[in-house]
């Protein structure tokens, strides 16, 4: 039977993670290793300055005390799995909210998939657009579950479609399954960020800040080398967005001009 490792950045008790586990339980042996608390926007951080420990909650279900999604994947692949029986797939999600455009550089969900592909395992990050996390407990993940089930079955049948150090980033629109127009292969769009630092004062008059969540605003890119639209546009038009992501962030098109510029 195929083996899948699941993680996320919303924490081990997230409704999105539990929905993901439920979607895949009949087609693979599923192990869950997730952070003990929410780690949203933690990026690809590894914990190097304090010890980490697993807490087993059920058969093949663990939380990692004070760990990040990258910690979860790294430790699971190097301790819970034997070298001869690594999982066939790492899936990070289902995130409560989108991970599109440059947001993936902040995303713990994307980082879980990044760590999987760094460790040599085909990996997927999947996120569900929603108005806010307050609605997540009663959210209907039917479309996301249907999508990840189909894509996982396709991977098992045909193999992973990307090469080394690349992963799939999937975003599910906030619509009912019957409203979905299908799937689109996309490119990362441009997220528009606004000043959303909120100044407050405690009872002693000391200032502190809360970083708010930016409204999901974006602009379509005009520098795309291919005809694919953006992840933002696809979900806005009621398509499931599937973006191939590579970890090599070298700007190759700038190499020649940089060589000329550096001649001092």
From Swiss-Prot:
Source organism, top-level taxon: Bacteria
Enzyme class: hydrolase
Catalytic activity, as annotated: a ribonucleoside 5'-phosphate + H2O = a ribonucleoside + phosphate
Gene3D superfamilies hit by this protein: Survival protein SurE-like phosphatase/nucleotidase (3.40.1210.10)
Cofactor note: Binds 1 divalent metal cation per subunit.
GO molecular function: 3'-nucleotidase activity; 5'-nucleotidase activity; exopolyphosphatase activity; metal ion binding; nucleotide binding
EC number, as in UniProt: 3.1.3.5
Subcellular compartments: Cytoplasm
Protein name: 5'-nucleotidase SurE
Species assigned in the record: Helicobacter hepaticus (strain ATCC 51449 / 3B1)
């Amino acid at each position: 039977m195929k083996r899948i490792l699941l993680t996320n950045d919303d924490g081990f008790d997230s409704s999105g993670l539990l929905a993901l586990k439920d979607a895949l339980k009949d087609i693979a042996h599923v192990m869950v290793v997730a952070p003990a608390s929410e780690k949203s926007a933690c990026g690809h951080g590894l914990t190097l300055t304090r010890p980490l420990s697993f807490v087993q909650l059920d058969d093949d279900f663990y939380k990692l005390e004070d760990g990040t999604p990258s910690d979860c994947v790294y430790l699971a692949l190097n301790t819970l799995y034997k070298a001869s029986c690594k999982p066939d797939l790492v899936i990070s999600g289902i995130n409560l909210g989108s991970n599109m455009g440059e947001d993936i550089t902040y995303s713990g969900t994307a980082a879980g998939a990044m760590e999987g592909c760094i460790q040599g395992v085909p990996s997927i990050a999947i996120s569900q657009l929603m108005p806010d996390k307050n609605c997540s407990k009663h959210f209907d993940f039917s479309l996301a579950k249907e999508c990840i089930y189909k894509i996982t079955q396709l991977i098992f049948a045909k193999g992973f479609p990307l090469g080394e150090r690349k992963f799939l980033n999937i975003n599910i629109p906030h619509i009912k399954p019957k409203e979905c127009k299908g799937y689109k292969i996309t490119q990362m769009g441009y997220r528009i960020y606004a000043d959303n630092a909120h100044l407050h004062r405690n009872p002693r008059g000391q200032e502190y800040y809360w970083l708010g969540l930016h409204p999901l605003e974006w602009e379509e890119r005009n520098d795309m080398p291919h005809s694919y639209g953006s992840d933002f546009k696809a979900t806005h038009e009621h398509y499931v967005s599937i973006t191939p992501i590579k970890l090599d962030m070298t700007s190759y098109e700038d190499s020649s001009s940089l060589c000329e510029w550096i001649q001092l």
